[in-house]
C-alpha cells in the first residue's frame, strides 16, 4: 500500500463555495463577525492571491459524509493560499422538530445537528438551501449525496455551470439506463460537461469527524494535476489521500462494496460466525473485481489493494450502516422491510446497498451474467423477499 504525506502531495458500456465578490455586505459582515482571530490571521497570510484568482469550493450535499467532507475542505481552504476561505454547502431544505430550518441552524451553530451532531464544521462553512446559488461562481464542486438523487441534481444544474469547473464525486452507486450502467462520475461529466474525479475509501464518516486516522483514494483520468489538487484539498494529518489513475476501478469499488456489506450483515444477523463472514467478504471482493473488469477492461488489479478496495470492504463489512441494517433484517427473518428499518435506524440517512444490489442485478440480468455472480444475485433476491436470509450461503461459488 502506498502512503503519500499530505505535505508531499503534489468497455463494454458507456457508462457549496466561496464568497462571491458580489456577496451582500450584510452577509459578509455576518460571516466575518463569526470568524475567529485565527481565521482572520489566516486570511491575511494568504495575501499572495487576490480573491478573484482563488478557487471556490461548493459541497453539494450535507448528510453525514457530506458534512465531514465540508469539515475537511474548510480546514484546508483556510491554510491554502490558492483557495477562497468560504466553503459553501448545499443543504436540502428541511425543518427540524423545533420548527427551525436545518440550514439556519447550521449557519447559527456551525454544526449539522441532524446528521453530524457534536462536530463543528468550521466557521467558514456556509449552508445554502438554494442549489443554484450554492454553486454560483464555484469552480470546484464536491458531490456527496445519495446516488438516487444525482440524476435530479444534475438536471437542475444543467446549463447553470459555466467556466472552467472541476468536480469530484464521493457518491457511491450507479444509474442503470437502457444502454447499460452509468457511473455517477460519468453522469456528472455528461450532463454538466465537466471533468469529474472520484474519492472513495475505507471511510466511516463519524470516525473521520473525530479525527481518527483514515485513508482514501482519489480516482482520476487524464492529467495528474487536478488529482493532486483534490488530494491537497482533502488531506489532513489524520486523513491520508492517494491518487490512482483509474476512475472506473475506484468508483466501482466504492459502489459494489455496499452489496458485499449487505451480505455480511445477513451473516451477522444469523450468527453464522467469523469464518463465514470472512468467506463472504472474500467472495464479494472477487465478484467486485470480476464485474468491474467485465464492465471496464481498463480497470487495474492494483486498485483493489488501495483504500477504495479491500480496505473499504473490510471497514464496511465490520462497521458500516449497510451491514448494521442488513443484520437487523436477517434477525427479523425478513419480516421487517428495509424501508422500515432504514427509517428507524438511520434517522434520515439513506441506505445505499439495497438499491445498488437491485441495480447490479438489473445489469447482470441484462447481460446474462446472473450465474457468474451468485453472491450479488443472492443478495438482491434476499432483499426483495424471494429468498430467505439463510440463502446467503446456500449456493456454489462460480469460478470466474
Swiss-Prot record:
Substrate binds at residues 172, 321-322. InterPro entries: 6-PGluconate_DH-like_C_sf, 6PGD_dom2, G3P_DH_NAD-dep, G3P_DH_NAD-dep_C, G3P_DH_NAD-dep_euk, G3P_DH_NAD-dep_N, NAD(P)-bd_dom_sf. Its EC number is 1.1.1.8. It holds the Pfam family NAD_Gly3P_dh_C. Its main location: plastid. One of its GO terms (cellular component) is chloroplast. Expressed in young seedlings, flowers and siliques. Expressed at low levels in roots. One of its GO terms (molecular function) is NAD binding. The active site is at 257 (proton acceptor). It is found in: Plastid, Chloroplast. Involved in glycerolipid metabolism. NCBIfam families: glycerol3P_DH (TIGR03376). This is Glycerol-3-phosphate dehydrogenase [NAD(+)] 1, chloroplastic.
Amino acid at each position: 500500500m502506498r502512503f503519500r504525506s499530505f505535505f508531499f502531495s503534489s468497455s463494454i458500456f458507456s457508462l457549496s463555495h466561496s464568497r462571491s465578490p458580489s456577496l451582500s455586505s450584510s452577509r459578509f459582515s455576518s460571516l466575518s463577525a463569526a470568524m475567529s482571530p485565527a481565521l482572520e490571521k489566516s486570511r491575511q497570510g494568504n495575501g499572495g492571491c487576490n480573491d478573484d484568482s482563488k478557487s471556490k469550493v461548493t459541497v453539494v450535499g450535507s448528510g453525514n459524509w457530506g458534512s465531514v467532507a465540508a469539515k475537511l475542505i474548510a480546514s484546508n481552504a483556510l491554510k491554502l493560499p490558492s483557495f477562497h476561505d468560504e466553503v459553501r454547502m448545499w443543504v436540502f431544505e428541511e425543518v427540524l422538530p423545533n420548527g427551525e430550518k436545518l440550514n439556519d441552524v447550521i449557519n447559527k451553530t456551525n454544526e449539522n445537528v441532524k446528521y453530524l451532531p457534536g462536530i463543528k464544521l468550521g466557521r467558514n462553512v456556509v449552508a445554502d438551501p438554494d442549489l443554484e446559488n450554492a454553486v454560483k461562481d464555484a469552480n470546484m464542486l464536491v458531490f456527496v449525496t445519495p446516488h438516487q438523487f444525482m440524476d435530479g441534481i444534475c438536471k437542475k444544474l444543467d446549463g447553470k455551470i459555466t467556466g472552467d469547473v472541476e468536480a469530484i464525486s464521493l457518491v457511491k452507486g450507479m444509474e442503470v439506463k437502457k444502454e447499460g450502467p452509468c457511473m455517477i462520475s460519468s453522469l456528472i461529466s455528461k450532463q454538466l460537461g465537466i471533468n469529474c474525479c472520484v474519492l472513495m475509501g475505507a471511510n466511516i464518516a463519524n470516525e473521520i469527524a473525530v479525527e481518527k486516522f483514515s485513508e482514501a483514494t482519489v480516482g482520476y483520468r487524464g492529467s495528474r494535476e487536478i488529482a493532486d489538487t483534490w488530494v491537497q484539498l482533502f488531506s489532513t494529518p489524520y486523513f491520508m489521500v492517494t491518487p490512482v489513475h483509474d476512475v472506473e476501478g475506484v468508483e466501482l469499488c466504492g459502489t459494489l462494496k455496499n452489496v458485499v456489506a449487505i451480505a455480511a450483515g445477513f451473516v451477522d444477523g444469523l450468527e453464522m460466525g467469523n469464518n463465514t463472514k470472512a468467506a463472504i467478504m472474500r467472495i464479494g471482493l472477487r465478484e467486485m473485481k470480476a464485474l468491474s473488469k467485465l464492465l471496464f477492461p481498463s480497470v487495474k488489479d492494483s486498485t483493489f489493494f488501495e483504500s477504495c478496495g479491500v480496505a473499504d470492504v473490510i471497514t464496511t463489512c465490520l462497521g458500516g450502516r449497510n451491514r448494521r441494517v442488513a443484520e437487523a433484517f436477517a434477525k427479523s427473518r425478513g419480516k421487517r422491510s428495509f424501508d422500515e428499518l432504514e427509517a428507524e435506524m438511520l434517522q434520515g440517512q439513506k441506505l445505499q446497498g439495497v438499491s445498488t444490489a437491485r441495480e447490479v442485478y438489473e445489469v447482470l440480468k441484462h447481460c446474462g451474467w446472473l450465474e457468474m455472480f451468485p453472491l450479488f444475485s443472492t443478495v438482491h433476491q434476499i432483499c426483495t423477499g424471494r429468498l430467505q436470509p439463510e440463502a446467503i450461503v446456500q449456493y456454489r461459488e462460480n469460478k470466474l
